[in-house]
């Protein structure tokens, strides 16, 4: 549970908020992108004659880099996985990225954090070009001060390094002079929580996305939120979610 010292409170709630950063994952946190991703994964696998895994296995493709998922769940070598990923992009880059929808009350959440002067960032393992197109599609790009996605040419592939870059670009401290942490990482998979914890963030795991409550607990999420309203309550400190 995050504690805020009385000295910190005395400086005023507005100042606290102005020093804070919130970093969101995209898939499974801001948007429900299951349809577009899984249809595009299926398209890619069928194009190369692979058997389609059961749905519960396909769900594991939501979150980590897809090249890794093709190797892990379909037994591909790296070179083959990269070819299949390219085929995935043929469909996802034109159709699949828009087979997607915002979760309920996301706009209200983004309004809140902008109005309360958080620095707002996106950190996603999705290629950054897709992430920006999706934010534009939903007319929410203006809420974000920083957007960082995967960029293979720059060596940005895994969540920890993507999150690290987002934190650096935000330019705010991780803690105040009392040691209270100032950066939230909000995501639905263990990769979000583990990366946030390793980098000194306050980790908020959302159970409405693609990771299970067990997965988020095992990753040591500091807070668990069952819906977007729970995120709002957590940020308001009106309802402190106990570490489970």
What is each stretch, according to the model?
Residues 54-57, 66-69, 130, 162, ...:
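Hydrophobic alpha-helical segments typical of transmembrane helices
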Residues 29, 36, 128, 191, ...:
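Conserved Rossmann-like nucleotide-cofactor binding loop
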Residues 41, 109-135, 148:
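Substrate-recognition element of Asp-dependent hydrolases with the DxDx(T/V) motif
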Residues 2, 13, 18-20, 134-244:
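Asp-based, Mg2+/Mn2+-dependent phosphohydrolase catalytic module
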Residues 81-85, 131, 159:
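Short amphipathic alpha-helix in the helical subdomain of ABC transporter nucleotide-binding domains
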Residues 19-108, 116:
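N-terminal helical cap/lid subdomain that shapes the substrate entry/recognition surface
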């Amino acid at each position: 549970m995050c504690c805020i010292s009385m000295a910190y409170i005395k400086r005023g709630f507005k100042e606290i908020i102005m020093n804070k950063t919130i970093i969101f994952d995209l898939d499974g946190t801001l948007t429900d992108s299951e349809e577009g991703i899984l249809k595009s994964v299926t398209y890619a696998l069928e194009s190369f004659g692979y058997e389609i895994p059961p749905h519960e296995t396909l769900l594991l493709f939501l979150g980590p880099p897809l090249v890794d998922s093709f190797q892990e769940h379909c037994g591909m070598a790296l070179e083959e996985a990269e070819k299949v990923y390219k085929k995935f992009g043929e469909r996802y880059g034109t159709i699949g990225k828009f087979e997607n929808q915002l979760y309920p009350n996301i706009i209200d959440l983004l309004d809140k954090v902008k109005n309360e002067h958080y620095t707002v960032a996106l950190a996603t393992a999705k290629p950054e070009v897709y992430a920006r197109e999706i934010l534009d599609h939903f007319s929410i790009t203006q809420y974000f001060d920083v957007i960082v996605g995967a960029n293979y040419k720059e060596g940005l592939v895994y969540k920890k390094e993507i999150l690290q870059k987002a934190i650096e670009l935000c330019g705010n401290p991780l803690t105040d002079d009392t040691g209270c942490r100032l950066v939230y990482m909000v995501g639905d998979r263990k990769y979000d929580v583990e990366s946030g914890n390793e980098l000194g963030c306050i980790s908020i795991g959302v159970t409405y996305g693609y990771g299970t409550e067990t997965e988020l607990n095992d990753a040591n999420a500091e807070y668990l939120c069952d819906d977007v309203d729970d995120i709002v309550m957590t940020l308001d400190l009106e309802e402190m979610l106990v570490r489970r």
